[in-house]
Amino acid sequence: MNAMNFLKSLVFCFFLTTLTTSYSQENQKPNILFISVDDLKPSIGSFGDEFAVTPNIDELSKDATVFLNNQNQLAICAASRVSFLTGLRPDKTKVWDLKTKMRDVNPEVLTLPEHFKNNGYQTIGVGKIYDPRAVDGGRDRRSWSVPFVTQNQLTFSDGYSFPSGGFYQGKENRAVRAKLRQEAIDKGVNNLNKYESDRFKPPYENADVPDGAYMDGAIANRAVELLDQMDTTKPFFLAVGFLRPHLPFNAPTKYWNLYKEEEVQLAEFQTKSKNPV
């Protein structure tokens, strides 16, 4: 199975996360592929967006349950992910910000992957599932029966290394950030990535690179490997967390070329509201 076929096989439940199941002939426990997509709003054909080019998701939606009335209880990444993965509202989790650790305030809280682990599943994750600022080690170790795959364990397409700052593969952007990094080293700065990003962090990148050069492509490739390596004697819960379309809007050129810039309509509202609630 290659990464593109893997991506085409995903069934999306559009908000934060997606769930698909297939059944083991041996024990009839469903194998579960759980997919998290960061900041994906319903600009999708199956949600009525006529401009969006989303044929694979649209096709999958024909046989899926599409939710049209979803409510976000707290529009902060860490809080919403903890709420979703525990089934508890933020007033119960006590995670309202981007720094509170979930188990510091709820040591015995039961998470979704932990529930499956407790019921005989092999549980493993890759990519962004929890917000790393809200859990220990960026992954919540108790949730997984197999060590979580971190970003530093990912491999990228031949000829490409880890994206600069975690985001950039374009030659010009990498060159600017490399110059800033050397500048930071010469100054004795400790947090090199912060120094770079404070001075140069483009909101998008259009680079003619393969899918596997960017983080999401590498995550998809690793997910395929994990599926092939699963213990077939046990059911699995595999969580795959993609980072895009959260800012910065970085993607290979072939995806940008699906749209003509002159046909893209700007959002009607482009300034902050005067009296936000």
Could you tell me what each predicted segment is?
Residues 9-18:
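Bacterial N-terminal signal peptides
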Residues 2-8, 21-277:
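Formylglycine-dependent sulfatase
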